[in-house]
Amino acid sequence: GDTVFLREGSYGEFVVPTRSGKPGKMITLKSYPGETAKIDGSDLYIKGWGNALVQVNNIDYMQFENLHICHAHDSENNTDPEGIYITGTSGNITFRGCKVYDIKNDCPLVDAKGDWRSAHAILVLGTDDNTPIRNLLIEKCEIFEIHSGTSEAFTLAGNVVDFTIQDNEVHDVENIGIIIAGGDNLNPKGDISVNYARNGVVRRNKVYRCTHEKSQDYWSQSVSNG
């Protein structure tokens, strides 16, 4: 049940937990009381998919509190800048009071090969057919300034069960703010009987200014209200 306090400042490194907590003994990573710690990707090389600032892969019983997760940029298609990526068989994961912002892919919305721009503030993707991502709580977080292209700011997809998304604020993002979806192209080999997010609660979230108005080459008006 260890707690790691991060002092005020910017941390220019990927956060990739390698150990899990236990029932009743959560591992916690949080800003020191009264201070703000930033997981800052300004100087990091972002390439491909899953190369998020915070990567939670096959981890159990861990929580993140009051962190700023920000500044992940790229300008290539087939690259997905991500603030938070939760995948594999992770369970009992909490993000509380975090701010995720300035996650951007700045390439053209679609290139000459037909590849589309993509990025995510938070991507939750259950990729194991036998063990879902489970008991996920995302609350009191703020997501903004996301250039997600044709992806969504906050995505739950694949084998994900028993989640709660509550009291968050999502604004000033491209395309859709929050989506609860099937695995589709994100997990194309998943068993269709479990390859979708289910049995969850989404409540009391504020979602606004989700628009492609700045992508004038394809859309000149808002395409989503949330």
How should these model regions be labeled?
Residues 81, 92, 115-123, 135, ...:
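Hydrophobic, well-ordered secondary-structure segments
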Residues 20-22, 159-162:
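Short, surface-exposed basic-aromatic patches at helix termini and helix-loop junctions that form
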Residues 11-17, 41-44, 48-52, 73-82, ...:
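Short glycine/acidic-rich loop motifs that flank beta-strands on beta-rich extracellular proteins
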Residues 7, 87, 157:
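Residue-level recognition of the GNAT/N-acetyltransferase active site
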Residues 26, 32-35, 60-71, 91-104, ...:
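Right-handed parallel beta-helix
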Residues 7-9, 32:
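Active-site-proximal beta-strand/loop segments in catalytic clefts of secreted hydrolases
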Residues 11-28, 38-65, 69-91, 121-130:
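Extracellular beta-strand-rich solenoid/capping regions of secreted or surface-exposed proteins
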